[in-house]
């Protein structure tokens, strides 16, 4: 595969951008390909190579790249202005669309990213409960703000996951393993009346794809209600992807607050917090808990979300369900054929293959994966025209633009890659 122009651009980029990229997840050795354009299920690089894309911008592109309806509506909005600094009618319209779909949503506050949404939701929970401590799950990613960038450590006090984060900032962030009821009960009992919220990815999408065990989200809802703790479901990835009402509809669990991003902007940068009216009204200016942003509710992102909801219907979810099921079954068949005991996890249009013989149900079991061979697998797929995230701990996504032919070509590439690695 020819990547001369990408190498040339990367060599230039490292002089102007830290590591040559604007987000570390995009970096892989020896250098990433540089995109030129994308359409539907395909992304094209500056060297003219075509890839079937399962990264999809890390989740926002439910319809694939450059959806015609969203483009048309975006051009219309572009001519009307890109930032007003005052409210617009479309903000109200998109809020109503979210409220119509999401079980917990009685009010919505739009932000500029999922990071802003989770940061503000945690601040809201702390302000409402007048408590400082929060619980997150090991391996869960809730954005790049200090309170949640915490690695595994003592359940009593989190340690910063990056230089530059004071220990005092994370001392109130406690960690527990996902899907472990007893560990969470113990942690809550040890910190009675001190915990403001539990924040959870209902399907953990940043250690690959780890769904909750049956009844686990119900358990979270029950134990938070019993202890006066707010439950925040982080739906930045799952929201409007695994069902019309997100994971809370899919698993029939209604949180106090939920955070969104990615799909709710139709491919434009956005975030959102949704929840019960009595809580949401505590945000300024109706309440005292501060939350703001220059580009919050900007016309381009709001318009993109409205355009996405105009084409998102029941048939979209039926197609995504069939494609996800077909794809996972195909991978399992290949593993059986090659006698490789790896595990495939997935929920609807989210999928990941784990390079381990262990069942993966939390952070520790995900870490048993062979990340070195996964990276080799990534490069072999790339050589065969398939683009997935380069990390074992990211999730793969299917869009409504992925055809059966795309899936079959991908399964063929997967078989070739695994055969080269293990046979």
From Swiss-Prot:
Record-linked Pfam families: Aminotran_3
GO cellular component, one term: cytoplasm
InterPro entries: 4pyrrol_synth_GluAld_NH2Trfase, Aminotrans_3, Aminotrans_3_PPA_site, PyrdxlP-dep_Trfase, PyrdxlP-dep_Trfase_major, PyrdxlP-dep_Trfase_small
Gene3D superfamilies in the record: Aspartate Aminotransferase, domain 1, Type I PLP-dependent aspartate aminotransferase-like (Major domain)
Keywords: Cytoplasm, Isomerase, Porphyrin biosynthesis, Pyridoxal phosphate
Pathway the protein acts in: Porphyrin-containing compound metabolism; protoporphyrin-IX biosynthesis; 5-aminolevulinate from L-glutamyl-tRNA(Glu): step 2/2
Reaction catalyzed: (S)-4-amino-5-oxopentanoate = 5-aminolevulinate
Gene Ontology terms describing biological process: protoporphyrinogen IX biosynthetic process
Cofactor: pyridoxal 5'-phosphate
Modified residues (N6-(pyridoxal phosphate)lysine): 262
SUPFAM superfamilies registered for this protein in UniProt: PLP-dependent transferases (SSF53383)
GO molecular function annotations of the record: glutamate-1-semialdehyde 2,1-aminomutase activity; pyridoxal phosphate binding; transaminase activity
Chief site of localization: cytoplasm
EC code(s) of this entry: 5.4.3.8
NCBIfam families found in the cross-reference section: hemL, PRK00062.1
Family, similarity comment: Belongs to the class-III pyridoxal-phosphate-dependent aminotransferase family. HemL subfamily.
Protein name: Glutamate-1-semialdehyde 2,1-aminomutase
Lineage: Archaea, Methanobacteriati, Methanobacteriota, Methanomada group, Methanobacteria
């Amino acid at each position: 595969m020819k990547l001369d122009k990408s190498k040339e651009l990367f060599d230039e980029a490292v002089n102007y951008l830290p590591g040559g990229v604007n987000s570390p997840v995009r970096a892989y050795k020896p250098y990433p390909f540089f995109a030129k354009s994308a359409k539907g299920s395909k992304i094209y690089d500056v060297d003219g190579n075509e890839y079937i894309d399962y990264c999809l911008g890390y989740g926002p592109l439910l319809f694939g790249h450059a959806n015609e309806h969203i483009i048309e509506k975006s051009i219309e909005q572009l001519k009307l202005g890109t930032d007003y600094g005052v409210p617009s009618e479309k903000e109200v319209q998109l809020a109503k669309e979210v409220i119509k779909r999401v079980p917990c949503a009685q009010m919505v506050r739009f932000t500029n990213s999922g990071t802003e949404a989770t940061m503000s939701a945690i601040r809201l929970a702390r302000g409402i409960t007048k408590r400082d401590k929060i619980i997150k799950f090991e391996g869960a990613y809730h954005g790049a703000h200090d309170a949640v960038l915490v690695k595994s450590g003592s359940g009593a006090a989190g340690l910063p996951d990056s230089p530059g984060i004071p220990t005092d900032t994370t001392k109130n962030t406690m960690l527990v393993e996902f899907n472990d009821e007893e560990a969470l009960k113990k942690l809550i009992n040890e910190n009675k009346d001190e915990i403001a919220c539990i924040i959870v990815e209902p399907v953990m999408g940043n250690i690959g794809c780890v769904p909750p065990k049956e009844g686990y989200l119900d358990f979270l809802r029950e134990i938070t209600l019993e202890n006066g703790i707010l439950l925040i479901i982080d739906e930045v990835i799952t929201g409007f992807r695994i069902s019309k009402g997100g994971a809370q509809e899919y698993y029939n669990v209604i949180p106090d607050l939920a955070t969104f991003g990615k799909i709710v902007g139709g491919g434009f940068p956005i975030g959102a917090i949704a929840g019960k009216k009595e809580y949401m009204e505590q945000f300024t200016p109706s309440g005292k808990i501060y939350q703001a942003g220059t580009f919050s509710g900007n016309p381009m992102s709001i318009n993109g979300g409205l355009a996405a909801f105009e084409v998102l219907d029941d048939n979209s979810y039926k197609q995504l369900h069939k494609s996800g099921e077909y794809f996972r079954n195909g991978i399992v068949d290949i593993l059986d054929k090659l006698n490789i005991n790896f595990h495939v996890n997935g929920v609807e249009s989210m999928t990941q293959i784990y390079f381990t013989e262990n069942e993966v149900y939390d952070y520790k079991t995900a870490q048993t994966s062979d990340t070195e061979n996964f990276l080799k697998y990534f490069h072999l797929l790339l050589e065969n025209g398939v683009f997935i995230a380069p990390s074992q701990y990211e999730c793969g996504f299917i869009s409504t633009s992925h055809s059966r032919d795309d899936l079959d070509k991908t399964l063929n590439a997967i078989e070739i890659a695994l055969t080269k690695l293990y046979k």
